[in-house]
């Protein structure tokens, strides 16, 4: 079985609404409230422990590190979200190397988010992913050097 990855952004509501002001949101279904509660990911993210048998990456950051995976023109690059927060300037911008080009990202610390700047969003796919998952689906990707 092969999974298809889907480019996406995980950003604050304020950031999204500023860029897409006509966005509407579907409400939660009240009859599924108990199901939503049981499916909360809090337990998974509460510790660094991996809760199932799976090969762990032999390199890079801890398995549950939040990463941004960038893909374009046959290049795949991982960027650690913690690292982006560290290097972002006071306006929330960070620059990383993706293949032979420099890519500008918009970063927030609280909550921790990162997205491609407008000039790169059309030509580069990005997705937020945990290191353990990302390394498994894209083992050829390199770790960015900001």
Where are these regions (language model features)?
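Mid-to-C-terminal functional-domain signal that highlights helix-capping/loop sites
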Residues: 1-146
């Amino acid at each position: 079985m092969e999974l298809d990855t889907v480019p996406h952004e995980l950003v604050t509501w304020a950031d999204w609404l500023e860029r897409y002001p006509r966005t509407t949101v579907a409400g939660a279904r009240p009859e599924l409230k108990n199901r939503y509660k049981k499916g909360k990911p809090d337990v998974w993210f509460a510790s660094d422990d991996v809760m199932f048998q799976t090969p762990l990456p032999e390199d890079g950051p801890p398995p549950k590190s939040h990463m941004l995976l960038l893909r374009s023109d046959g290049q795949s690059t991982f960027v650690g979200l913690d690292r982006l927060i560290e290097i972002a300037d006071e306006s929330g911008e960070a620059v990383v190397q993706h293949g032979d080009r420099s890519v500008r990202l918009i970063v927030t610390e609280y909550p921790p988010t990162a997205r491609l700047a407008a000039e790169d969003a059309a030509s580069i796919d990005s997705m937020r992913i945990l290191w353990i998952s990302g390394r498994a689906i894209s083992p050829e990707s390199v770790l960015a050097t900001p």
